[in-house]
Amino acid sequence: MTEKSIEVFQDLYLRGGSAASIRDCILSQVREPWQHDPERENDMKGFAGGDEDVIVLVRASFDDIDESGLVLWQEKDGYRVSNIVPRNVGELGIMKYNVILRDFVSLVAQPAAQGGGFEIDLTSPTQTLDDWLTADSAAALRRFSRLANKSTGASHPLDRERWFTFLITVHGTSKRLDTEQLARWLIEVEGWPAERAQELAIDYEFALVLLEQYDHSRP
């Protein structure tokens, strides 16, 4: 049976060609419902204090999505969308954030890329445990989760042993999920109580730091 996917914030990268060329192509395609915000752009450049360029665009409100500012930040090989910030509400949430991002791709980035010759890299809106962990680490976590007593976490000796196996396996790799991803996977995919999932996420973070410190302290 296919494991349930988790909805995640998408990332967008514009790569290839010079930053100046990408910038010019993007701005040449900006039209309603998008607009350029040079004032906010200059403010952000002043705060950044570096040589990286910033492009700030504003998407007018639509459906039940608030007017929002989209920030493109220069990287060595192009630009990436570093954030999308609503004007009148606290946060967009994953679904609305991704809707705005895909709207930008459709109305601005794709037409600009066709004329400018740069590439668009848009990540998936959903991910699974296998996107975040190696096969061995993912198998160890699934084994722990599916055999553990979800009301007690890793307190039973056998559950604790399987939890430690997962921690040690992850420690030996560079491919790791973060605490938010772990908690969301436990809750949304495996059905763990939120309190127990958060406890395990905290323990996971502490254990990896401790194991790394132990490695560094060895002669």
Specify the residue positions occupied by each region the protein language model found.
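Charged interaction segments
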Residues: 56-181, 185-208, 212-217
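Amphipathic, interaction-prone secondary-structure segments
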Residues: 17-19, 32-75
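Short, extreme N-terminal segment that most often corresponds to the first beta-strand
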Residues: 1-41, 219
